[in-house]
Amino acid sequence: MQIHTSKPAKTVRGEITVPGDKSISHRSIMLGSLARGITTVKGFLRGEDNLATLNAFRAMGIIVHDDGETLKIEGNGLHGLGEPADVLDCGNSGTSMRLMTGLLSGQRFFSVLTGDQYLRKRPMKRVLEPLNLMGATVFGRAGGDKAPLAIVGTSLKGIAYQSPVSSAQVKSAILLAGMYADGETQVTEPHLSRDHSERILRYFGADIETYSGGTRIRGGRELEGREIIVPGDISSAAFFMVAALIVPGSELLIKGVGVNPTRTGIIDILQAMGGDITLQNCRESSGEPVADILVKSSRLKGIEVGGDLVPRAIDEFPVICVAASLAEGKTVIRDAKELRVKETDRIKAMAFNLQKAGVAVVETENGMDVTGMEKLEGCTAESFGDHRIAMSMLIAGLAARDQITVNDTECIGTSFPNFTALLQGVTVI
């Protein structure tokens, strides 16, 4: 078991670039494989989750050249994938499994998706139900709710689907299946989730349109290979944003970060807490907004977080909880029940770890109440096999009275392989 320790910091200073966006990296491989011609991808995140997607498409006959800096994908068109000779292993990646389930439902072959012990516990029925309405044939354990998933490719028909959850993975699975469906497919959701799929589908030339409350796509249109420059992942930048806010005397510039408005809930929340965060050098790249983020240490205050802010910051809540634990007053988080079905139950995991660090935390069904304190206590924290829990508690250690040790940190490699090295480079102990 790998263990990491974080010690109290004097300051966090410097300029950094975080690895490429995880969501965009997944989608670049998928659409580059389905497009006609060559797609080049710069800034691809070489984390375990994204490599699982890359390996899956190689197993379906896609040729990908990798020189260490740029991927060159030889796309075979919408119907150019080949039947895999073995089970496709998604590792810990829910994005890989859910999006590929939609994409593979419209193929002309049989495939099976599996994952690690954590992914095999995560709910899949939320994806299978709309796909079944489109005519897909997908089987899974627990009545279709758990992987492994067996997919018998078949003809699909367009549907109008009102999703009960605001989930980019559910929405994206339906849209990818919609590329193969007869007619038009529409998806609406309670609150707008991240829209990377819509943007990249449009960038590759899909017949897709977004409107107030939803998205529609018409099947059958071929995609064309493109050049993609993947921006830095705001979910990875979030750890360093919080680090600079909670350690007095800190100032940090994070360069080239994707600031898609469906992902900037973390910035809105931290600014509402009193965080000194400014965007500089705003520009656009490959259909996505990008900026440099300047963060200065700040006295934070507790706030209420809920509603449409939640899906815009869904992956950042573990480190938001760390910020809340060091804010003046109480932070109330609601409407975040989705956190209970991530890589682990993130509400329970963060409550457990912050309580060990001396923080007053009360769990609710769909969130938590966190009462801030001036300094956290040193402790031994558990990652529960979740990369974001592990990294959040290592950030917490920077503002503790004594060191915080985190058990089982191998999981950090799923999204941020150089996290600890980058953190050490900007932290003065």
UniProtKB/Swiss-Prot annotation:
Phosphoenolpyruvate binds at K22, G94, R122, Q169, R346, R388. InterPro entries: Enolpyruvate_Tfrase_dom, Enolpyruvate_Tfrase_sf, EPSP_synthase, EPSP_synthase_CS, RNA3'P_cycl/enolpyr_Trfase_a/b. Keywords: Amino-acid biosynthesis, Aromatic amino acid biosynthesis, Cytoplasm, Transferase. CDD domains: EPSP_synthase. Its EC number is 2.5.1.19. Coiled coil: none annotated. 3-phosphoshikimate binds at K22, S23, R27, S167, Q169, D315, K342. GO terms for cellular component: cytoplasm. It comes from the Bacteria. It is found in: Cytoplasm. GO terms for biological process: amino acid biosynthetic process; aromatic amino acid family biosynthetic process; chorismate biosynthetic process. It catalyses: 3-phosphoshikimate + phosphoenolpyruvate = 5-O-(1-carboxyvinyl)-3-phosphoshikimate + phosphate. It is an enzyme of class 2 (transferase). It holds the Pfam family EPSP_synthase. Catalyzes the transfer of the enolpyruvyl moiety of phosphoenolpyruvate (PEP) to the 5-hydroxyl of shikimate-3-phosphate (S3P) to produce enolpyruvyl shikimate-3-phosphate and inorganic phosphate. Monomer. Belongs to the EPSP synthase family. HAMAP family: EPSP_synth. This is 3-phosphoshikimate 1-carboxyvinyltransferase. It comes from Geotalea daltonii (strain DSM 22248 / JCM 15807 / FRC-32) (Geobacter daltonii). The gene is aroA.
